[in-house]
Amino acid sequence: MKRILTFVLALSMALSLAACGGKADDNKGKTEVTMTAQEIMDTLKEKLGDSFGCDVAETEDNISGYWGLDMGQVESWASMSNSNSAVNSSYAVIVKVKDGYAQDAAALLQTGYEQILSYSRMYNMDLQKVLQARLFVNGNYAVLLILGAQGDWEASDEVQAKFAAEEAAKVDEAWRGIFGSADNGITIPEEDVSNNGGFFDMTDDEGKNDPVLGG
């Protein structure tokens, strides 16, 4: 009788452990986060160190103006860039929004990103880092991250691209440490070589290649 009871107890414990293991697997990559946007920004800054790259806090006007976000839908936000933005494109925008607005916020971040990318392509400025941008949507958080240490601008495109990818992997790791997953939703539009991304029309009315502002 004792043997039977011992066997039953052992079997019950084994089944319980298996069930717990199943729950752990189901929740893998689905970490519940309640941090504010600023707390997430501070965590990224701490984790990334020199690979963070941002040193200037942006204003709310920038969030609602340049990025076009509806502040009535935003519960908390944080945004930083680099003080030498002419040559360093590091940027981080984090918003925690109300239910149902995360995808809309992500679409606006994508639009703003495309303008940054056009500028980088035009001047070949920090381009490889910009091409490694991250757009994350986790629950009610929407985030655009263009982060990474500065590479060697005199290196070949291949070397710069490799370095930027390695830096972006650090961003993924830091984000995964907070949310459990790092699924990048950024879309990289094809380069429009006909008009330099829409900033300038490089031909005048006679078809010459003299720069003309505005288009």
Task: Give the role of each language-model region.
Residues 15-19:
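C-terminal motif of bacterial Sec signal peptides marking the signal peptidase cleavage site
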Residues 2-10:
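Sec-dependent signal peptide recognition
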Residues 21-91, 97-215:
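Soluble, non-membrane globular domain cores that form compact, hydrophobic packing
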